[in-house]
């Protein structure tokens, strides 16, 4: 839903549509963490490439993690992207210790000349659709439901051992 809204705004306003996501792998590598992911960067790029003009994955390094919420708004949203619209989910957080949130984005919208659009979480049977929910249904063996929640075919990549 969020990507669709970004694409629609780009088309309507004759602007480049950009999705910015955070590539957590550099930080996880530093911390020695190997989380279960539904999709890694390359898969995300493949999935989104026809939907928007640009997918930018910011490497989430320790120095990026230390960036204040105010600096994130000024340096990333304003100076780097020159954003006219900022489209986020209701629980979007950013900046050091997740101090930035939707409320802060709204407070700075006039100062940095962007319009904030907040997308509500999608639900299925009164439950918020999340990566955790999708992982649960996959573990339960319900790939059909996983595909319904994702909105695209669920894929698994790996090596088959005999």
Protein language model annotation of sequence segments:
Residues 1-162:
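Nucleotidyltransferase catalytic core that binds NTPs
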């Amino acid at each position: 839903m969020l990507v669709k809204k970004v694409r629609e705004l780009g088309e309507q306003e004759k602007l480049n549509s950009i999705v910015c996501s955070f590539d957590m792998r550099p930080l996880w590598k530093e911390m020695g963490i190997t989380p279960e992911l539904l999709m890694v960067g390359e898969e995300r790029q493949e999935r989104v490439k026809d939907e928007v003009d640009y997918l930018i994955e910011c490497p989430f390094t320790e120095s990026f993690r230390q960036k204040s919420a105010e600096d994130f708004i000024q340096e990333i949203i304003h100076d780097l992207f020159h954003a006219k619209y900022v489209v986020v989910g209701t629980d979007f957080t950013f900046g050091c210790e997740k101090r930035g949130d939707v409320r802060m984005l709204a407070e700075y919208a006039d100062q940095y000349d962007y319009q904030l659009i907040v997308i509500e979480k999608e639900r299925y049977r009164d439950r918020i659709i999340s990566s955790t929910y999708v992982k649960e249904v996959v573990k339960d063996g319900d790939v059909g439901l996983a595909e319904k929640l994702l909105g695209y075919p669920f894929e698994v990549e790996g090596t088959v051992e005999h």
